[in-house]
Amino acid sequence: MTILYKVEGKEFSKDSVFPHKKVLCSVSARNIVAFSALQSAIFPASHGGDAGDGSLPGAGLAVGASNSHVYVCDIVTPWEYYKVCSSKSLISVLQWSPNGEQLLLGYVGGRVEIWQPRNQSINLWVLQYYATVPSEDIIEAQFFQNGKGVIFNALKKDHTYYAEKFERVEQQRPTLSGFGGVASEGCVLLTSSGLLAAFSLPAIQKTSAAGADGPAHEVVELTPALHSIGISRSFIEHCSMTPSPSGALNIAFSCGWQQQLVQCFKVSLSLEGELGLEQHLAIKSESQTSIFLGPLDGRRISHLKWTRIANEDVIFIAYACPDGAGSQLEQWTLTRRHQSVHALLQGGGGANNKPNEFVQSESWEQVGKVQLNASLADISVTRLSVSTPDSCQVYAILQDNSVQVLEPNSMKQLNHTQFDRLSDASGAVKFVSGDLTPSSQILLIFDSHAQLYAMQAPLPKQGGSGLLLLEYCIVTGCDASDVLLLNLGNLEALVEKLTDNFTRQPSFVRHFYYANFLALKSNICRMQQQEFDNLIILHAISTTFKSLLRPSDLGFQDKGPADNLAIKLAESIPDVDTVMLNLDAKDFTVEPVMLQSLQQLIQWVTDLALNMLHRLPEEVMKTKLSGKRPSYDISRDIVAISSLRELLVMIRIWGLLNTQCLPVYTKTMDNIDVLVILFRLLTRLAQNPAEPDEMLLDECSLLSKQLLIPQPTKFNPTTLLSAQGFAAVKSGQLQFTSMEEPTCLQDMETEEVVFASSVKDGVSNLQLGARPSHIRRCARCGFVFVNNASKVAKTSALKAWFSKWLHCHCGGFWKQVH
């Protein structure tokens, strides 16, 4: 296994007021790591909980009280973390929602909180819901499942269509179904006394996409439904909870006074009450086949882990051996058998009833065990829904700062990695917890000082290729940053194959996954220092502009205005006015006030076309000299060229309705018509984008002499997904210091351009000045978005445009910058 990086946390104090230094961690589907530090901490004053102002690090430090602190960080910027909240109570549960946008915190004392980032800003968190189970200690929690699962089958990597590669989990149901079978959102809790609590999240209370300076946020108090998990209550020491395909939750726990028994229960939820009236949540708990252990000989259970491997229920039981003699890990699998029934006990007897010759029985069987040389800190199992056990691995995180990778069933050791060796000092740093990323490619580990370690997980026997993992992320919507951080080899060939496979999908499949595909491809191109974000913005502007078009006569239109425009442009007419005369102008009529509000977007479209044509001769020359082409170049993308031609025709028509919406340029001669020139050159480029003719290149070279070409805005944040970060990860193990941006990953490229010191809003295409007061910047790609977008938008078209940017196009979170 390869150690990717380590983040030293100098902010955390070496002396803790708690008897045990305990760090909980959890990784979301968006590759955001949440961890809790149950000790005194020194943190940046700008990253303070729900009252934080979101400033950049380095604005000052503040000493935190001896409380429980919760932080989050991105795996591509692990040195920079943000505070979620602090509490005087000890945190016992840390759990992400399935979509990675809500964080559940369970405390000793019975309080449960659900936090979420405000306006998708990773450094500004707000309390959304809370509930209380008085005089109880929360020891386990699980969000409701939506019943949508995808099987990862490495044997189908050669299939063409996504529907064949990634099958849906059959007969999987949500934890709680509402009206019409729609999955409900909520949580199930288990306390240390065996009390179950469940509550659903009201959908109407979700945070709107208002600006950061919008109305005050309202915290919703929820009343949970309570039910005892068993007939009697008892003190639970260790437990594990996992969803089952039937929609129920499987729970296994061990009690302190009954160490040789691991009890198993199935918990199901339902809504009781008449439809249309007030319904309440009902909890049903059923006892299942339990595990009866043999003589423990002084051992005590230290960990329980219930999971599903290849459609089988599996429980891992870890024991702490006496006198510090290491630990032991066992795997128990639930087997189902058909037992024959004696003829006298068989049912039936009627004319239509057949006797029951067999009855199904369940039992737990121990299939493997392994002796570990050190105490076990945590267990992690492959998070992918695999089809075969060969695609799954078990990770035993040991307190001697080592990790053992085990094979399921046989429990044979596949790999062993030793991190920093443990010293003999009593205050030595030890591994305490860990978790896998969504695609199970990176194992993240925290030690007792809340320092983060990242290691590349070894590929299993049927691990699949990097291409298959990336396509899996496209289909499931999971973040693919952990896959991109691996040593994928030839990125250009990977992008070409990924694009080729995507274009082979049916049109409705491409349309459904297009946003996920663009976000993934933009991250890959950013690692190759290639510009792909322009295509995403161009696609968003194109859909926004086309949504404004309405046919003049609904009764005699079998195609919309956008379809008719595409048909006319297929004839490759070089004159934009000729194309405009062949169209019905009434179909493109838009209110002049609305067109005025879209002027900055219109300016962006023509700026992109102008820059693309201006750089075309230089790009062609680079290709001839180097002998190889980049994996992506927008000037060779026929889809982008066609979208630009369509938008130029629409802009030409709208300019007749309102001249104030037309783009503005500084020209050397007054008789230059920019739209006519751009459309003519783009039409000629569309005929052969792979090899433009010499005459076209000559005309493109003259553009800089005819008008002033605006310089494109570049966003170059310091992340591991940049070209510098990708090269550093491939070179070997990296070491970072928390809250210190590594200089080795910074982009040192500087250009003397107009507005070089000015910040530009990438969404509105507006210059915000050198020091804007409130902006949002993407934590991954550096894209800038104004905070008060809802106040700027005066028309419905502009409001629809801003609503597209609730999330950044690259899949990252926003970061509030003051």
UniProtKB/Swiss-Prot annotation:
WD repeats lie at residues 86-125, 296-342, 615-666. One of its GO terms (biological process) is response to lipopolysaccharide. Keywords: Activator, Nucleus, Repeat, Transcription, Transcription regulation, WD repeat. Residues 175-524 are annotated as: Interaction with Dif. InterPro entries: MED16_bridge, Mediator_Med16, Mediator_Med16_C, Mediator_Med16_N, WD40/YVTN_repeat-like_dom_sf, WD40_repeat_dom_sf. The keyword Disulfide bond does not apply. GO terms for cellular component: mediator complex. It is found in: Nucleus. Its main location: nucleus. Component of the Mediator complex. Interacts with Dif. PANTHER family: MEDIATOR OF RNA POLYMERASE II TRANSCRIPTION SUBUNIT 16, THYROID HORMONE RECEPTOR-ASSOCIATED PROTEIN-RELATED. Component of the Mediator complex, a coactivator involved in the regulated transcription of nearly all RNA polymerase II-dependent genes. Mediator functions as a bridge to convey information from gene-specific regulatory proteins to the basal RNA polymerase II transcription machinery. Mediator is recruited to promoters by direct interactions with regulatory proteins and serves as a scaffold for the assembly of a functional preinitiation complex with RNA polymerase II and the general transcription factors. Required for activated transcription of the MtnA, MtnB and MtnD genes. This is Mediator of RNA polymerase II transcription subunit 16. It comes from Drosophila melanogaster (Fruit fly).
